[in-house]
Each structure stands twice: as C-alpha cells, then as structure tokens.
Amino acid sequence: MKKSLIALTLAALPVAAMADVTLYGTIKAGVETSRSVEHNGGQVVSVETGTGIVDLGSKIGFKGQEDLGNGLKAIWQVEQKASIAGTDSGWGNRQSFIGLKGGFGKLRVGRLNSVLKDTGDINPWDSKSDYLGVNKIAEPEARLISVRYDSPEFAGLSGSVQYALNDNAGKYNSESYHAGFNYKNGGFFVQYGGAYKRHVRVDENVNIEKYQIHRLVSGYDNDALHASVAVQQQDAKLVEDNYSHNSQTEVAATLAYRFGNVTPRVSYAHGFKGSFDDADLSNDYDQVVVGAEYDFSKRTSALVSAGWLQEGKGENKFVSTAGGVGLRHKF
C-alpha cells in the first residue's frame, strides 16, 4: 500500500508541474486556385495561373503563468508557425513573449503583435493567396521584437503603447513607436492603431522618412452578427525624390452572420489614388472576397471563399481572381 501511494505521488508530480502550461494551436490547409491578367495600353501582356495545396497559417504554441502573489503574475508564450507543407522552421516566429500582469495592466517583451495588427479583425479570412483576403490594407501589420504595455480596461476603454528598438528593426530601419486604444460597449466597438518610424528602407532603391500610419475600426460584434468598417491612412517622405510627399488612404468593410452551423461572410476594400510628388498614382484598387464557414463542431470547420482584385483602371490594370476550399481544426 505504501509503495502504491509513493508511485502514485511520483506519477502526479509532472502533471502538477505542467498544470499552468497550455498547449494550443490551429491546423488549417486547403486548395487554392488563381488567375491574374496584366493589361498595358489596353493589351493583355501577361497571364498567370496557379493551383496548389497550401497551408493557411497553421500554428502551435505553449503558454502559461505563475502567481507571484499580491495580484501579480508572470506570463509567457512561445508560438510558432507549423505549416503542414513543411515550409516553416524555427521557434518563436509568431507572437512569443515573457512579461508581468496585474492590476496595473500587462507589460511584455518579445516578438509581439503590433498595435496595428491587433485591429486586424477587418480581415478575418484564412488564406494563403493575397486575393482571398483583404490583404492590401493589412500589409502594414507586423510582429515586432519590442516592448509593449497594455492598460487594464476602464468602463470599456483600454489602451496600448509599444516601442521597437533601433537595433531590432534591421540595418536600414529606425526604431518605431506604436499606440492605440480599444473601446467596447455591449456589442459595439471602436479601435485605433497607429505607428511612426523615422526612416524605413522599402527596398534597395527606395528609402522613406517620417513614415506614419493610422487606422480606425468601428463595428458591432456578438455571437451571430459581425459588421465592421475601417479607414487607414499612410504617409511618408521619399528620400530619392527630394523628400516628396507620399500618401494613400484605404477603406474596408466586412459583414458576417451566423445561421446555425453556417457563417457566410463578405469583405470589400478600396484603395484611393495615392499622392506622389503632388501627382496621382495608379495605385488605386478594388477588392471583394466572399465565402462561408461550416462548423462540423466547435473545433473543426470547412472553409470556402472566392476573391477578385483589380489594381489600376482603364488600359493599364492588373486583375486577379481566385477561389479556395479548406479545412481548419483548433486545439
């Protein structure tokens, strides 16, 4: 009897040690097909098509916390991509951090979602293709090696500030500053996210200074209905062209409604013509994505979507269409 009790106690020790550690993740994959046509001077100059089995953003993570007393907790998370196609490698390549949480809010350091990325509910699509999600407006979203503070919620209002150091931004990029707020009242919500960088290297021949971005999202979200609209504005100075002024404004909207196990969804995004040295650019675009999810259970869902994107107008434009089906399981 005594030996059995000792054996049972020893067997329970690893379980007790892991009690505050959570394993979680999502496996999602599917088949996507696309066709892109480029027009120049009214003539078709290129046509590209493709169909393939793709990973839709699978991930696996570990997270936990320790009670330090007096309402203070240590928190941590290690999350990484987990492509079923075997194309991902490394640890902590998604949101991964260590920090403290208490009545003062939450303070974390590591690879963290930018404040702007946390306003990304406007793009809820699971896709690999840029044509099956409103990815144009989502391009500035990122995960940054940074320090971030999130305040506690007061009467539905909370705020965040974030700082990414110069040495973590890359050789030709400066430090960046980020801030935002969230307001919730019943199902209604308002979100703001913004960022500023002194200088950024876009590519070898394009450098910009005084880059700033602002996004405002508002909508309604409950168990059945989700409706949101967003407006985003970017502004910068182009170094190679005598610090000319560059800016673009984009808008997007998403509507979804749950009918039993089925959730149909539609998104629309529009990019207005950008300003480049006081001249209009042909970088305007329109994008539409429609689709639906069917829930087999709380964890497993089937996905289907179709998308259309047009950049430019008239004789010079780029038009793409795409479709996809997939399966998603959460654990």
From Swiss-Prot:
Q: Specify whether Transmembrane is a keyword of the entry.
A: yes
Report whether Ribonucleoprotein shows up as a keyword of the record. no
What's an example Gene Ontology biological process for this entry? monoatomic ion transmembrane transport
Which Gene Ontology cellular component annotation is one that this UniProt entry carries? pore complex
Annotated Pfam families: Porin_1
Q: By its UniProt entry, which CDD domains does this protein fall under?
A: gram_neg_porins
Give the UniProt subcellular location, in the record's own words: Cell outer membrane
Q: Which GO terms describe its molecular function?
A: porin activity
Supply the alphabetized keyword list. Answer: Cell outer membrane, Ion transport, Membrane, Porin, Signal, Transmembrane, Transmembrane beta strand, Transport
Membrane topology, as annotated: Multi-pass membrane protein
Q: Which SUPFAM superfamilies match?
A: Porins (SSF56935)
In the UniProt record, the signal sequence range is: 1-19
InterPro entries in the record: Gram-neg_bact_OMP, Gram_neg_porin_domain, Porin_dom_sf, Porin_Gram-ve, Porin_Gram-ve_CS, Porin_Neis
Its family remark reads: Belongs to the Gram-negative porin family.
What binding partners and quaternary form does the record give?
Homotrimer.
Q: Identify the PANTHER family for this entry.
A: MAJOR OUTER MEMBRANE PROTEIN P.IA, PROTEIN YDDL-RELATED
Q: What does this protein do?
A: Serves as a slightly cation selective porin.
Q: What is this protein called?
A: Major outer membrane protein P.IB
Which organism does this record belong to?
A: Neisseria meningitidis serogroup B
